[in-house]
């Protein structure tokens, strides 16, 4: 499985885009990764997620939790490939929680699944819920790790690929200076 070129599959799926983007963080970028475009193609998603499943072979875990929306399909496919249960967390009144009869039992060893990890905010919210329920987070699995060097987590990251995507403050954005209009493709509501 190591001969899979994840970047090529992301590009073929139109999941890795070039242009001028306003990110959910408020920063601007010339590249954007929209893994939903990959996840709409089950055969391609299966290949990419197999790269993560391979990395998890030596990790001791018994359940996968994906935050809605981006982590739901990743959780399902990763659970299928690792033969572990896969569930999801979702927001209720803006607070991340485990619902729908899903549960984390005391002592469960949990992998959090994501499509893209940028700041780790969603993963950390899910980790807090898991730990409050008595579970232990043993790692974060994602298709794309696009964290900047200064973004650290307390958990190991198991990704299909690492992308370094430059971001800029609006005032320092060369694309804005060239009057190139931006697209706001993000999934998190900006306030």
UniProtKB/Swiss-Prot annotation:
Its cofactor is Mg(2+). The keyword Repeat does not apply. GO terms for molecular function: magnesium ion binding; orotate phosphoribosyltransferase activity. It is an enzyme of class 2 (transferase). Pathway: Pyrimidine metabolism; UMP biosynthesis via de novo pathway; UMP from orotate: step 1/2. GO terms for biological process: 'de novo' UMP biosynthetic process; pyrimidine nucleobase biosynthetic process. Keywords: Glycosyltransferase, Magnesium, Pyrimidine biosynthesis, Transferase. Its EC number is 2.4.2.10. Orotate binds at residues 118, 146. 5-phospho-alpha-D-ribose 1-diphosphate binds at residues 114-122. It catalyses: orotidine 5'-phosphate + diphosphate = orotate + 5-phospho-alpha-D-ribose 1-diphosphate. Catalyzes the transfer of a ribosyl phosphate group from 5-phosphoribose 1-diphosphate to orotate, leading to the formation of orotidine monophosphate (OMP). Belongs to the purine/pyrimidine phosphoribosyltransferase family. PyrE subfamily. Homodimer. This is Orotate phosphoribosyltransferase. It comes from Clostridium botulinum (strain Kyoto / Type A2). The lineage of its organism: Bacteria, Bacillati, Bacillota, Clostridia, Eubacteriales.
């Amino acid at each position: 499985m190591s001969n899979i070129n994840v970047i090529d599959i992301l590009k073929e799926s139109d999941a890795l885009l070039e242009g001028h983007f306003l990110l959910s963080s408020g920063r601007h970028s010339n590249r954007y990764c929209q893994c939903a475009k990959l996840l709409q193609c089950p055969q391609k998603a299966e290949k990419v997620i197999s790269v993560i499943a391979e990395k998890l072979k030596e990790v001791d875990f018994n359940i996968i939790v994906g935050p809605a929306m981006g982590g739901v399909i990743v959780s399902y496919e990763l659970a299928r490939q690792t033969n572990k249960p896969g569930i999801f967390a979702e927001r209720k009144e803006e607070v991340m929680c485990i619902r729908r009869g899903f549960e984390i039992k005391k002592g469960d060893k949990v992998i959090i699944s994501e499509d893209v990890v940028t700041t780790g905010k969603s993963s950390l919210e899910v980790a807090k819920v898991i730990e409050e329920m008595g579970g232990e987070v043993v790692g974060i699995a994602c298709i794309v790790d696009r964290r900047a060097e200064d973004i650290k987590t307390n958990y190991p990251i198991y990704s299909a690929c690492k992308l370094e995507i430059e971001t800029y403050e609006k005032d320092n954005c060369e694309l804005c200076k060239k009057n190139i209009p931006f697209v706001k493709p993000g999934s998190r509501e900006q306030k």
